[in-house]
Each structure stands twice: as C-alpha cells, then as structure tokens.
Amino acid sequence: MKINHYQKGVGLIEVLVALLLLAVGVLGYSILQIRAVDASSEALSRSQGMLITRALAENMRANPGAQTNYPAAVRGFTNITAAPTVPSPTCYNSVCTPAQMANFDAYMAARSAFAIGMNITMADCPGVGSAPIKRQCIFVAWGNTTLSVSGTTADVSNCMNTSGVYVNGSNCLMMEAY
C-alpha cells in the first residue's frame, strides 16, 4: 500500500480558514450589537427629551395668561452649569400669579433636563421670522450639542438651521409649543 505524503497539513489549513471566517462573522455580529446599543441610547434620550418638552408645553397651555412670559423664563435656565435653584414662590401649594407659575414651570423643566444631562431653551420656531404672531418652539439638546442664550435670544444653530432642518450629527429635538 502506497501512502501519498504530499497531502499533509491540508486539513489544518481548512480548519484555519474556517476559523478565520468564523472570527469575521463574530466581529460583524459584535459591531451590530454595538450599533444597536447606540441606537437604543439615542432612542432613550429622544424619549426623555420629548417627555420634558411635552410636559412644559402642557403647562403652557394650562397657563394661557402667561404665554408671553414662558420664552424668557425658559431661556433664563438655558446656560445653567449646576442644578437650578428653586424660584420663590415654589407654586406647589401657594397661590401664584401666571408669571410666577411660568417661571416655576420653566424651573421644573430645566431641573428635569439637567438631571439627565440635557439643556433646554425656547426660541421662535424656524421659518416664522416675519409672521405677525411668532410660534414658539422648545428645544432640548444633549451630548455634544449645545444651546445658548445671549441677551434675549436663544442660539439653537448647533441643533437646527433657520429653515427647520436638523444639523447633521446633532443630538437635539424641537417641539412647537404654541
């Protein structure tokens, strides 16, 4: 019986190729898992931001006498770097004027946003620069996206351009309030 010796090691090469293919497959699956975790984190942040903006918008609708007070009240809490201080009166049990209630509602929204690493502001909605009654929008940003206020104007250019299109790569959302 004659044995062919030129076939030695071929089985080992096949095993190494199979292991290489398996490693590439596992690496691809790991990358998919990382992307899924990132997408879940982004979805959580968007949901939390929507809860904050919706709560503030509902408070604004419940306090129509102070609608003009809300933009300045919310912008007053935009550039905070520490937990905001409670305004006086607290408006939990005390009787407050509509303007005081607007300030307290803005504080509650800013406190909620700050607690989860977000920033909140209020500005004219995009595309209403010449409208007789300018709609107001609530903006919430997190991560590397910043919102700022200079004087009485909110700068949301890191979030959205003037025509209402989100900036590519920004972590923010906008809700029309009234």
Where are these regions (language model features)?
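Flexible, low-complexity segments enriched in proline/glycine/serine and punctuated by aromatic residues
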Residues: 41-44, 51-178
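Aliphatic-rich helix starts adjacent to a transmembrane/signal segment
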Residues: 2-54
